[in-house]
């Protein structure tokens, strides 16, 4: 039998806004770390006239910019996906892979909408397929 605290915690977590914001923050953190890691691996073209200190500062700025961009992208992706999945789950009153596919489509379409309708459709299909494959790989739903 769950305690009152466990029931309250579950009620808070069932709130779509809480899920979305939490996923956005976690996605932003992941994007920040990935940006730092990938920025460190990047081999920028530096001028031979730059001193070691100038090269270090240039590389640090590039890493920071890449990290910030990755942070924003992953935060938005996590927030949109989580919010869409939660809303669809509550509307359908089911917890299955269809929710993941719809949320993936919404996320992919909205993330690539700036490229026009064709890009939005490709983003929708691609992210939906990717989301379902990840879902099947981790087998969250039984």
Curated annotation (Swiss-Prot):
Subcellular location field: Mitochondrion inner membrane
Keyword vocabulary terms for this entry: Membrane, Mitochondrion, Mitochondrion inner membrane, Transmembrane, Transmembrane helix
TM ranges: 21-41, 70-88, 97-113, 120-137
Cellular component aspect of the GO annotation: TIM22 mitochondrial import inner membrane insertion complex
SS bond list: none
The keyword Transmembrane helix appears for this protein: yes
GO biological process: protein insertion into mitochondrial inner membrane
Signal peptide: none
Keyword Transmembrane helix: yes
Membrane topology of the entry: Multi-pass membrane protein
Family: Belongs to the Tim17/Tim22/Tim23 family.
Function description: Essential core component of the TIM22 complex, a complex that mediates the import and insertion of multi-pass transmembrane proteins into the mitochondrial inner membrane.
Record-given protein name: Mitochondrial import inner membrane translocase subunit TIM22-4
The organism of origin for this protein: Arabidopsis thaliana (Mouse-ear cress)
Species lineage: Eukaryota, Viridiplantae, Streptophyta, Embryophyta, Tracheophyta
